[in-house]
Amino acid sequence: MLSAALLLLPGLPLAGAGATEEPTQESGPLGEPPPGLALFRWQWHEVEAPYLVALWILVASLAKIVFHLSRKVTSLVPESCLLILLGLVLGGIVLAVAKKAEYQLEPGTFFLFLLPPIVLDSGYFMPSRLFFDNLGAILTYAVVGTLWNAFTTGVALWGLQQAGLVAPRVQAGLLDFLLFGSLISAVDPVAVLAVFEEVHVNQTLFIIIFGESLLNDAVTVVLYKVCNSFVEMGSANVQATDYLKGVASLFVVSLGGAAVGLVFAFLLALTTRFTKRVRIIEPLLVFLLAYAAYLTAEMASLSAILAVTMCGLGCKKYVEANISHKSRTAVKYTMKTLASCAETVIFMLLGISAVDSSKWAWDSGLVLGTLFFILFFRALGVVLQTWALNQFRLVPLDKIDQVVMSYGGLRGAVAFALVILLDRTKVPAKDYFVATTIVVVFFTVIVQGLTIKPLVKWLRVKRSDYHKPTLNQELHEHTFDHILAAVEDVVGHHGYHYWRDRWEQFDKKYLSQLLMRRSAYRIRDQIWDVYYRLNIRDAISFVDQGGHVLSSTGLTLPSMPSRNSVAETSVTNLLRESGSGACLDLQVIDTVRSGRDREDAVMHHLLCGGLYKPRRRYKASCGRHFISEDAQERQDKEIFQQNMKRRLESFKSTKHNICFTKSKPRPRKTSHKKKDGVANPEATNGKPPRDLGFQDTAAVILTVESEEEEESDSSETEKEDDEGIIFVARATSEVLQEGKVSGSLEVCPSPRIIPPSPTCAEKELPWKSGQGDLAVYVSSETTKIVPVDMQTGWNQSISSLESLASPPCTQPPTLTRLPPHPLVTEEPQVPIDLSSDPRSSFAFPPSLAKAGRSRSESSADIPQQELQPLMGHKDHTHLSPGTANSHWCIQFNRGGRL
């Protein structure tokens, strides 16, 4: 767009370049043949216009690079000042060589091509919440302030002429000075943006000044057109209805421009909703429709700046949610590049245009009077308007803010382009107005731009400390918004918070569902996004710590705006796409067919696994037990399970079941000896081994540390408290070892319980008996967190595990003797009667209890009640209390089919 825009640069023979006469072949004398084929031909006129445009942009870019080579220069002098000075130098060189000014800033080039990218960039990336929070102050300064500055400056200059302080050769009346006051009083958005972005004042002050420079365009356009029409008509022909039409045109131009921008914003958001399969055209649609809004408003004589500002401000929320991450990046950098190039060309052409002395005439009284009046009336208007606004603002604007606002009223290329558009036949003093405008622009951009940063430092103005708000800040901000809206609703006052709350409800109910893609609308909740990220991180940690080939780099954690839906980036899908063998939910993958059902299933499992179920509320009753037994039991079980998870989170799990201390870890020597009593699955009945599932080939290990190790790693545990429970899947042969590992690494072996009796399936299917040991290491320290009153719930949980296996055989079970543990003294085994309590889940042999007493005599005072909930009702007498701080290996022989 910028390249096409600069094709209309003044001084370039663009029309002539396109319409150059084709060379005619001059024939020689009669009968002579035409000249032969030329090997080389210079065709400068065919490429002159685009070549010069490319050269200007290249020179401007190289100049910016040179300026930023010295950090000291750019920290003291604004970039806009350096570009204007560069334009003056280049204009002087061109004037000295060509003896005339070749290049100038034409109004058509400026308004149609150079200004739109700057305004679009400002409106699209404007903080909408901050803008609408200060909308009242912005409109006050933009409308009332601009009207005040225009009329007071024009009347004061007319009075100055009547007093004889302006030369008589300046032939201008009251309408002429009002016309000049309307174009010179508007704050320029390009100059404000160029200067204040380098000063870094606080966001409230910046949004008020910059918002004023954007919204005062409607007032400037109306005043300029009305005064220009009055000048062309003549003061004698102006009637009362013309004044009324001028007032009405203010509302038509401003509201019409805003309406045009909102219509194109709606079309842009609606169009990007259906670009999921053609992502490549998304950036093109953004620029085309925004530029179409500007041209439409300009065509209808409405405020084009206001139209493109409202278009960018209104469509960003929906467009950012619909387009892809790459498209957002392309839109951002393309828009910034176009705005930077246009701003650079504008300031350079301002400097070049000032060299041409044939288009301006000098009058000291007019120039000095204009400088004084625009500064004085600007400061007076800011003080009066701020006093009125502070009567209603919760956070008033202090005197320091008023000084910066008064000093920050910069004028720029908008005023220069408007004064160039004046008709010299209708306005005889045009040359004097042009010279005065150039001086005012140079003074505000160079002098005020150079001194505003030291002024801000001297006044100690609050600087901007922009940072991404945390989740806590966002929660409190939303809470305060709802509270203030509720207070206004209660007292019956429909204020700002009430209407903002109503707008948010309307947007959520209608606009977002219409203009945003369904997947984008469902995932835009920031609180849910945080929960989603935490679950993804836990899943990555689970896969990484579980010993699988997949590492944490194999799972990419997408950002919130970049993913299309939760189902597309769920943990299960990430594992499947990366070729992982781990599957978090097999049933979801096997049964779900539609994307919506898959998304709901994944979210259901995530919420059920990480959140408490809602507590039931019961009405008060006169009875002692008014809660039903089933509900109370279910809630107690859930609380117990959640407490178990939290306690286990404080323990550090490792990949090889090793207890780390502060000393440097050393590699552990694994034992390759086979356990006695375990059948070899490779030669069962002379058949090849079958394809075993993960429950038949590996054991699930829960690594739990002792109290000493927990204290030594307390600092590391606090840093990793949000990683969740980590399950380490390893082969059983790697778990059992023969002795201690050298150094501070130690494997804590534990005795095993007697396996349950073989089932009918194992009797009928011989290969079922070769499953191996499936052991679960659980520290007896965890039994301390089991309350005594939860014994029934624990036994029911153990019974539910047994119920998953095949039905037991009707024949009486044959009890086998356990082989002696490598680290436990072998003693004669005593058979244990399991028929007394069929619900008992496990039992400890007396020999192991005696071994426990021999190892830890000092802990004999620990009460037996601590281990009671983990045992059956009839097995308490076989346990020694001296084993409370030991590690136990509890083996559950699961069935071959679940």
Curated annotation (Swiss-Prot):
The primary location reported for this protein is membrane
Q: How does it sit in the membrane?
A: Multi-pass membrane protein
Q: Which residues lie on this side of the membrane: Extracellular?
A: 70-76, 128-137, 198-203, 271-279, 356-363, 423-431
Q: Where does the UniProt annotation locate this protein?
A: Cell membrane; Recycling endosome membrane; Cell projection, Dendritic spine membrane; Synaptic cell membrane
Q: What happens when the gene is disrupted?
A: Deficient mice are born at normal Mendelian ratios without gross abnormalities in postnatal development. However, deficient mice display significant enhancement of learning and memory accompanied by an increase in the number of hippocampal excitatory synapses in the hippocampus.
- Which residue ranges traverse the bilayer? 49-69, 77-97, 107-127, 138-158, 177-197, 204-224, 250-270, 280-300, 335-355, 364-384, 402-422, 432-452
Q: Where is the composition biased (Basic residues)?
A: 663-675
Q: Name one GO cellular component term.
A: dendritic spine membrane
Q: Keyword Calcium on this protein?
A: no
Tissue-wise, where is it found?
Answer: Highest expression level is detected in brain. Expressed in hippocampal neurons (at protein level).
Subunit text = Interacts with CHP1 and CHP2. Interacts with ARRB2; facilitates the endocytosis of SLC9A5 from the plasma membrane. Interacts with RACK1; this interaction positively regulates SLC9A5 activity and promote SLC9A5 localization to focal adhesions. Interacts with SCAMP2; this interaction regulates SLC9A5 cell-surface targeting and SLC9A5 activity.
- Which parts of the sequence are annotated with region: Disordered? 660-693, 826-866
Q: Which domain of life is it from?
A: Eukaryota
Q: Name one GO molecular function term.
A: sodium:proton antiporter activity
Q: Which NCBIfam families match?
A: b_cpa1 (TIGR00840)
Summarize the PTM comment.
Phosphorylated by PRKAA2; promotes its accumulation at the cell surface. Phosphorylated by CSNK2A1 in a manner favoring its beta-arrestin binding and endocytosis.
According to UniProt, the name of this protein is Sodium/hydrogen exchanger 5
- Give the protein's biological function: Plasma membrane Na(+)/H(+) antiporter. Mediates the electroneutral exchange of intracellular H(+) ions for extracellular Na(+) in 1:1 stoichiometry. Responsible for regulating intracellular pH homeostasis, in particular in neural tissues. Acts as a negative regulator of dendritic spine growth. Plays a role in postsynaptic remodeling and signaling. Can also contribute to organellar pH regulation, with consequences for receptor tyrosine kinase trafficking.
Q: Which UniProt keywords apply?
A: Antiport, Cell junction, Cell membrane, Cell projection, Endosome, Ion transport, Membrane, Postsynaptic cell membrane, Sodium, Sodium transport, Synapse, Transmembrane, Transmembrane helix, Transport
Q: Which family does it belong to?
A: Belongs to the monovalent cation:proton antiporter 1 (CPA1) transporter (TC 2.A.36) family.
Q: Where is the composition biased (Polar residues)?
A: 857-866
